[in-house]
């Protein structure tokens, strides 16, 4: 819960929603029959642990359209959609005149390694800052007064929380307004400041900028097949509900594959199986997945959006294992699980 100490010594911030994810699936767990498993997980946003962790974004206005160039690859998490929505919100400009470009070293600023689990928070904040600079420039170009106040974040170092006055926040711009800034560029950067592992002299080091939390429940039929997976995720601010639910559903199915069917045999580090024989979970075997996004005021960057990435698959396998333990009484410590209706012939390693 907020204010308690995480295993790494960091204080859980006010955005922590693990308890809420448990509450959200409580009735499902207790009223879905005898063969039910449950598991929780947390996942960091950002590289953290004192390593360089930048989000960088460059906005170019041409032809009354804002062009987004960010050093963040879209690897399935929908970063282009997230950035488009954040830039639209921050600039007060229509989504129809905002275009995200695939990242290129020729046009996008270098933002370090590509890690999907940090783009919503770090690159999203960089995009917000760049869009705010564009918004201020447009206020000045149109002779409007921009009024806002800023206060330091209560728990993120070197972060100021800005709030526009009601009159300023009500101003929205059109494509014709954006054309007034044709040929201009705006840059946004956010550095997720964290402490290195083993930092001495600091009782509660900040290992990561933010964390997401999740609880998954696996429900089995009498014959041992999976009836349903329920996945509740604390993601801070929900940016795009449909994309978020798709991420949760896809990651949960991946977790089912890890738990039940996938085998990745190696010979001195070299894979020996073909893609078709790895045992990826087949579509006709996929159970229903009930995705429950939990929205809670997030951290003081990127409008509180933490996002969702690898965490969607992390608690699935232990939840599945717990359900099968209640089904056949066997406590298993290796995956894929044995003795299930999905079990395949073991591949020699």
Predicted regions and their residues:
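C-terminal catalytic domains of large/alpha subunits in multi-subunit enzymes
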Residues: 1-45, 86-349
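Gly/Ser-rich, acidic/histidine-flanked active-site/gating loops
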Residues: 73
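Conserved strand-to-helix beginnings and helix N-cap segments that scaffold or border functional pockets
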Residues: 80-81
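Active-site-adjacent "gating/activation" loops or surface patches in catalytic cores
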Residues: 47-63
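Structural motif
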Residues: 65-70
